[in-house]
Amino acid sequence: MARLFGTDGVRGVANRELTAELAMALGAAAARRLGRTGAARRRVAVVGRDPRASGEMLEAAVIAGIASEGVDTLRVGVLPTPAVAYLTSAYDADFGVMISASHNPMPDNGIKIFGPGGHKLDDATEDRIEELVHQGPGSRPTGAGIGRVVDAEDALERYLRHVGKAATTRLDALTVVVDCAHGAASLAAPRAYRAAGANVIPIHAEPDGLNINDNCGSTHMQALSAAVVSYGADLGLAHDGDADRCLAVDAHGRVIDGDAIMVVLALAMQEAGELASDTLVTTVMSNMGLHLAMRSAGIEVRTTGVGDRYVLEELRAGLFSLGGEQSGHIVLPSFGTTGDGIVTGLRLMARMAQTGRSLAGLAEPMQTLPQVLINVEVADKATVADAQPVRDAVAQVEAELGDTGRILLRPSGTEQVVRVMVEAADEDTARQMAVRVAESVSAQR
């Protein structure tokens, strides 16, 4: 049986793979596993969602499951994922649930569960919740023991007060176009940026349940780039459906990805003495240009597997203060337990305001190396990289690249494919080397 939990919770097409029945079972299982026993007060969970149409159905089902196990729910409504993580801690809840499929298309949805303190669950806890889902319900409470539901009327205001601390200086001189992806950022992001003083021009901020991520947001940057140039804005910020990501656009309409944002923030934090151990945590997907920029600044880069959960684990283990992904998940542990796109946007604009420099100028140390990616279909993606001819081809490319590039072989998480990625000083070199290794992989079929 396939594992329910992926790298970011449980996801699927709503009402097909992710049914109301499964959502109720997940809510009940989370309540049984995470609801604290022996507490003097009633147990409580925080539940939020993004605005996609299926969210209301799944929210009702999750809450029903939670209530069936005698746990109360604080319903916070449509809010960003990092808001739910923060409020789980702020309300001293037993756990939190976010109903969202992030940047995925509207028909999809997902369920993310946060443990006490708003932290993402470890594999062992997810496995136990999954076991409880398959076991089905046990003995359930009746009467006064059934969980109750309360709407948390102050949820948005509490979250906005929290993220407002990320703006360490006033942003009155900045004009920013904000692409809210018709998602959970649509209300929160413009309010947060205006509260810090910025002149905010929101786009794609009218969610109707059906238009989330529809040719907008952090996975479709073209409209934002055009709007920044058209309005003569200082920058643009793009969020995804649940606002845990932030990508940027400079005044010329050029995209500033998560790697470049991390470089800007790492250098700022190093200058302020806030970059713990002079270390940045990122994943294997970050461009070699990030590593070169950090090396020039004397900043160590710790590399993890793909997924913000692995970045979070490394941040917690090493007590580091900045990490993230090329996709725009940027984590500042002093502000939260997960990536927060609004915090990222505020910190980026604060750096611009403090220095008086443009975003393009601040991002200049990040020189992205040309990258070539080739997908190779294979019979066994788990073992092909260990074949001696493939290892020899990789070793030869690594020797030729030295410190001027890199090669990465990675099995796809969803397809029977191995991805061959090469970065080099020029695209022709990267392509030649990628083809060479891809041919060695293909020969193993």
UniProtKB/Swiss-Prot annotation:
Keywords: Isomerase, Magnesium, Metal-binding, Phosphoprotein. GO terms for molecular function: magnesium ion binding; phosphoglucosamine mutase activity; phosphomannomutase activity. One of its GO terms (cellular component) is cytosol. Mg(2+) binds at S102, D240, D242, D244. One of its GO terms (biological process) is UDP-N-acetylglucosamine biosynthetic process. Binds 1 Mg(2+) ion per subunit. Activated by phosphorylation. The keyword Cytoplasm does not apply. It is an enzyme of class 5 (isomerase). The gene is glmM. Its EC number is 5.4.2.10. This is Phosphoglucosamine mutase. The modification Phosphoserine is found at S102. Pfam families: PGM_PMM_I, PGM_PMM_II, PGM_PMM_III, PGM_PMM_IV. Catalyzes the conversion of glucosamine-6-phosphate to glucosamine-1-phosphate. NCBIfam families: glmM (TIGR01455). InterPro entries: A-D-PHexomutase_a/b/a-I (IPR005844), A-D-PHexomutase_a/b/a-I/II/III (IPR016055), A-D-PHexomutase_a/b/a-II (IPR005845), A-D-PHexomutase_a/b/a-III (IPR005846), A-D-PHexomutase_C (IPR005843), A-D-PHexomutase_C_sf (IPR036900), A-D-PHexomutase_CS (IPR016066), Alpha-D-phosphohexomutase_SF (IPR005841). It catalyses: alpha-D-glucosamine 1-phosphate = D-glucosamine 6-phosphate. It comes from the Bacteria. Belongs to the phosphohexose mutase family. Its cofactor is Mg(2+). The active site is at S102.
